[in-house]
Amino acid sequence: MRVVILGSGVVGVASAWYLNQAGHEVTVIDREPGAALETSAANAGQISPGYAAPWAAPGVPLKAIKWMFQRHAPLAVRLDGTQFQLKWMWQMLRNCDTSHYMENKGRMVRLAEYSRDCLKALRAETNIQYEGRQGGTLQLFRTEQQYENATRDIAVLEDAGVPYQLLESSRLAEVDPALAEVAHKLTGGLQLPNDETGDCQLFTQNLARMAEQAGVKFRFNTPVDQLLCDGEQIYGVKFGDEVIKADAYVMAFGSYSTAMLKGIVDIPVYPLKGYSLTIPIAQEDGAPVSTILDETYKIAITRFDNRIRVGGMAEIVGFNTELLQPRRETLEMVVRDLYPRGGHVEQATFWTGLRPMTPDGTPVVGSTRFKNLWLNTGHGTLGWTMACGSGQLLSDLLSGRTPAIPYEDLSVARYSRGFTPSRPGHLHGAHS
C-alpha cells in the first residue's frame, strides 16, 4: 500500500526503511532540506537499551527543587503559561512513584533491547556505516547513594536478561583506561557490555540514501500545513495548495507531532530541550573508548572515530532553541573533569535539540482511532536507541504481521480508558 511518513529524523527514516522492505510504497515528507537535521542531528550518540529509563522517577520531584538552585543542574523548568505544559508536568509527577517507574522502565527496556537486535540485523544485512562501536556503556557514580540506588535498576535488567557488571571505583579503568586518572572522584559504576554507540545523523542519512535507492521517495523542503480527515480516516496531507494522498499515514514529527495532531488525536508529547558538544579528540589515550553516563549531571560522553560527543540535560521550556552559555559551561565542566586530556574542548561545536518526550518516558508506537493513521513518536532522549525497533514494530503492525515483542502498552491507548487499539492488518490491501 501507499504510505506517507511525516518526519525524516532517525525514527521516520527507520520507519520508511522497514515499511519499504515489507513491500509498501513509501513517501517521506519533511520541512528540512535533508534527513536528520533537527533532533537527530547531534544527540549524545549512545545506543543504551539497559539504561532506558524514564525521567519520571522516585525522588525526582524533590531533586527538581534542589536543582533550581544549582549551577550545573541536569533539569530546568521555565513555565511558558500554556495549559499543555502544566498538564504534561502533572502527568509526569504522577509517574514518579516506584510502581510506575518500574513499569515504564520495563517496557522501555523491552523496546530498546529489541531495537538493538534490529540494528544488529540491519548492520549485518547492509553493512551500514555510522562510526559505530560495540564497547558497552559505563554509568559513573559520584556518591555512595547513587551506587546503592543502582540495585533498583539492576532488578529490571535481570528481569530483561540484560548482562551487567557493578564495579567499584578501583575497577573502572578496566573498562575505560582513561578513567584511571580520575577514579578517586568516583564511587563506582554500572557497566552494560552489550550497549553500542554511533553517530545518529550519519546513520540516518546513510539509511535514507539506502532507502531512496530501494524506492522510497523523499519530499524535503515541504512544510506540512495539516492532516485532512473525514470521519475515521485521514485522506490527505496538505501543504500550500498541494495535497498528497496515501492509504496510510505515519506521524513521526517528534516534538511537533502534538500540534500537527491537534483536534485529531491527543498525545502528550512535549519538547524536552537538550544540548551537546562535539569535540575533536586531543589525546587518544585520554579519550573514552565507548559511552560514559555521568549519573550526577545526567550527561553522556560518547566516543566516535575522531570526535567526542558530550550531550545531556533537560529543559522544560517549550520550543525555545536558544543556545545558552551556562549549559555549554556545564558540558565543558563534566568532560574536562572526567577526561582532562581527551579533547580540544575550545574547538567544540555547540548544539541544541528538542526531544519528543512523553510524561511516562515510553514512546507512542502503533495505531489510533483513525483507521489509517499510525504513530511513531515520543521517544524522548532514546530516539536513536529505539529507532530500528520502533520502525520494525510499526511496519509489522501496519502490514498485519504479529510483532516479535508485546506492543499493546506502547500505543496511545494507555493514555485513555476504554480505548482499544485497532486490530493489526485492518487496512484493506495490507501485506501479510
UniProtKB/Swiss-Prot annotation:
<keyword id="KW-0560">Oxidoreductase</keyword>
<comment type="pathway">
    <text>Amino-acid degradation; D-alanine degradation; NH(3) and pyruvate from D-alanine: step 1/1.</text>
</comment>
<dbReference type="GO" id="GO:0055130">
    <property type="term" value="P:D-alanine catabolic process"/>
</dbReference>
<dbReference type="InterPro" id="IPR023080">
    <property type="entry name" value="DadA"/>
</dbReference>
<dbReference type="GO" id="GO:0005737">
    <property type="term" value="C:cytoplasm"/>
</dbReference>
<keyword id="KW-0285">Flavoprotein</keyword>
<keyword id="KW-0274">FAD</keyword>
<comment type="function">
    <text>Oxidative deamination of D-amino acids.</text>
</comment>
<dbReference type="GO" id="GO:0008718">
    <property type="term" value="F:D-amino-acid dehydrogenase activity"/>
</dbReference>
<protein>
    <recommendedName>
        <fullName>D-amino acid dehydrogenase</fullName>
        <ecNumber>1.4.99.-</ecNumber>
    </recommendedName>
</protein>
<feature type="binding site">
    <location>
        <begin position="3"/>
        <end position="17"/>
    </location>
    <ligand>
        <name>FAD</name>
    </ligand>
</feature>
<comment type="similarity">
    <text>Belongs to the DadA oxidoreductase family.</text>
</comment>
<dbReference type="InterPro" id="IPR036188">
    <property type="entry name" value="FAD/NAD-bd_sf"/>
</dbReference>
<dbReference type="GO" id="GO:0005886">
    <property type="term" value="C:plasma membrane"/>
</dbReference>
<dbReference type="Pfam" id="PF01266">
    <property type="entry name" value="DAO"/>
</dbReference>
<dbReference type="InterPro" id="IPR006076">
    <property type="entry name" value="FAD-dep_OxRdtase"/>
</dbReference>
